Amino acid sequence: MQEQYVPQSIEPAVQKHWDAKKTFKAVEKVDKEKFYCLSMFPYPSGRLHMGHVRNYTIGDVISRYQRLNGKNVLQPIGWDAFGLPAENAAVKNNTAPAPWTYENIEYMKNQLKMLGLGYDWDRELATCKPDYYRWEQWFFTKLYEKGLVYKKTSSVNWCPNDMTVLANEQVVDNCCWRCDTPVEQKEIPQWFIKITDYAEELLNDIDNLEGWPEMVKTMQRNWIGRSEGVNISFAIEGQAEQLEVYTTRPDTFMGVTYVGIAAGHPLALQAAATNPGLAAFIEECKNTKVAEAELATMEKKGMATGLYAIHPLDGRKVPVWVANFVLMNYGTGAVMAVPGHDQRDHEFATKYGLDIKAVIKPADGEVDVSDAAYTEKGVLFASGEFDGLDFQGAFDAIANKLEALGHGKRTVNFRLRDWGVSRQRYWGAPIPMLTLADGTVVPTPEDQLPVLLPEDVVMDGIQSPIKADAEWAKTTYNGQEAFRETDTFDTFMESSWYYARYCSPDYDKGMLDPAAANHWLPVDQYIGGIEHACMHLLYARFFHKLLRDAGLVNSDEPFKRLLCQGMVLADAFYYKDEKGGNVWVSPTDVKVERDEKGRITKAIDNDGREVIHSGMTKMSKSKNNGIDPQLMVERYGADTVRLFMMFASPAEMTLEWSDSGVEGAQRFLRRLWRLTFEHVSAGAVPALDVAALTSEQKAVRRELHKTIAKVSDDVGRRQTFNTAIAAIMELMNNLAKLGSDEQDRALMQEALETVVVMLSPITPHIGFELWKMLGKGDDVDHATWPVADEAAMVETEKLVVVQINGKMRGKLTVPAEISQADVEKLAMADASVQKFTDGLTVRKVIYVPGKLLNIVAN
């Protein structure tokens, strides 16, 4: 029994014990309620950062809590191992992505173990292994056979430096999010999965996600973007083709004064063939910013095509303009423009001298659209037969007329677009499609799967090795020459179903073992960043429905409850170099002085240079303000780091790293160790006799059981882990009131056992050791979470403070149900009260039941 708390000596030993005993191995048990807890798996970048530590600690606390509550817990871990950073690192370090990735996995695995995370390592998977992506390829061919996969030429965001397609969300200020290179528009053939076929279900089922944060649900609803409107066909003067547009505001249709089309629209390209100026403008539009946030703020530009559309209801000719804010891959690539009632259209019309016509006004007034569009719904005017109609009346009447004339159709539209899964990179799962000599495209036969990605490659930093190697693509199909697809899957493919593969990671007869999948799924608790709301979390929901429709799972949704943890922030410091640039200095290399409010007033780096404090910001490589978790674990121990992470902030809020906060967490653990050591060193502990407890002892026991109730609710239901820890710390202060008689010691034993079990999900190593120290036979990992004793929480007595003229003059311990009159009698009979009322006349008595008696006398 060690007198001092030395985490560096106990933590490795406890971790070895867990490994040897396979404490966290999960086995399907039909007689025990299951709980599947999952944190988003890491990309093996080389080292864990504090964001990982926070995510995985939260998941581990929930898992351990559920295990102590008798659940059969599955908590697996694996590696989201494909992706561009491995290629960039391989080029930089003159290696191949595979060895770089596998080395990182090994290193990070040891880091995860060092944190004491209770994973079932037998289920570990890496998405870059053929036994994983084989089933992804197989599933893709099945989706192709069902008509849910297609290939088409598509305008994409192209990064010329990384030579890959970027999603709209990966374009920041018209530059690549990874390398800051200006993005171009490029037409290339791509594979798509029809997520739009599931748009309605994905939207409707959001209502069933009761355990998800409202913000994430709102983000997904907006991303899917269901709208009801009308598809309208315009005839083009002198052309056989019709121009299709979609609008949610057919009530404004009589106010159309021009039509905007995308630079890639067939009509635009046709007009440009004889118009060099237009051709040059279209070329310029190829580099238009396409991230939606930027579309709203960028300069609107356009050029007339010389073509005219015929308004289908009043026969007016309206000019057709190429506009840089109309995108070919959104909707039909054309929009009807109503500058009187749409501000973007108004700005464009004003800039280019186009007509602005008002057709909607408030029900109780007039409208002026000379300076700005009137965008509210109202009553129609200047609209012929539709004058006087309100929004819904006009919507129906105009839609009906367009349908009757064969120029329109009511339709439900979605902002969501089909999922482009092709990537022009090497380090990803090969797309399992073949092209035959005659151009026919077929899926790779099942007996040829997996299509293996060669790992022994040389990276030149320019072209994918499987694109550069003509021999790799050559294969046969039914005796014919065939060529493999050289694009690889978007890495969101792997992360869209990994949670299901954990249920049977070694199963080789299919993608999933249905019995195991249906035993564990859906995931009961998922933990990850809110930045994944509209991509990973939506794709995983989509994939789950695909798996269900393939008969592989029988649930509709993958994740019952979702917790989005906040970011980890740290102080950032910099100084200016000779050129005026910022040189960022690690906070671990800076000494600071603070004022009385804790604000930094001066900061000096290790070279004696005064540095500028730029505030608390997200830990990042760019600002050099990441705190190395390994360094912190080596210095303070994993339990201290875990305790600080869970205590310093509510789980879903940002967490500010603080050395003093970490030191405070360690002081608390030392105090707990010392208290337990002193208690155990005092010898054998008698049995607790509740009936024999004094009122002071009952008060301590009452606080103990109130704490059990609060911590159970905070951890289990509310997931406010910081308030649970605060309650345990407060309880520890109360334990100091206990003396050394037999029932004091018996009560201390009950309290320490309770505290150790309740803290063990957060600080499992010290929990393991203290449980043994307290003489408990089995591991704390197999203990039972304490249950609050309702009888102990009932207050039979109250402590009433007695004041004379607002000053405290005594305290009374009284029965809980005592009347005011009886409290007054006891107070007036109390010697210390009599001393201050002697010779005075009582004028008034104020009583706060069970708390305070204030006697006003003069």
From Swiss-Prot:
Any Pfam family the entry gives: tRNA-synt_1_2
Domain of life (superkingdom): Bacteria
Cellular-component GO terms for this entry: cytosol
Record-listed E.C. numbers: 6.1.1.4
Root EC class: ligase
Keywords: Aminoacyl-tRNA synthetase, ATP-binding, Cytoplasm, Ligase, Nucleotide-binding, Protein biosynthesis
Protein location: Cytoplasm
Main location, first listed in the record: cytoplasm
Motif window: 'KMSKS' region: 618-622
One GO term of the biological process aspect: leucyl-tRNA aminoacylation
Catalysed reaction equations from the record: tRNA(Leu) + L-leucine + ATP = L-leucyl-tRNA(Leu) + AMP + diphosphate
Record GO terms (molecular function): aminoacyl-tRNA deacylase activity; ATP binding; leucine-tRNA ligase activity
Positions of short motif 'HIGH' region: 42-52
Positions with a binding annotation for ATP: K621
Family to which this protein belongs: Belongs to the class-I aminoacyl-tRNA synthetase family.
UniProt protein name: Leucine--tRNA ligase
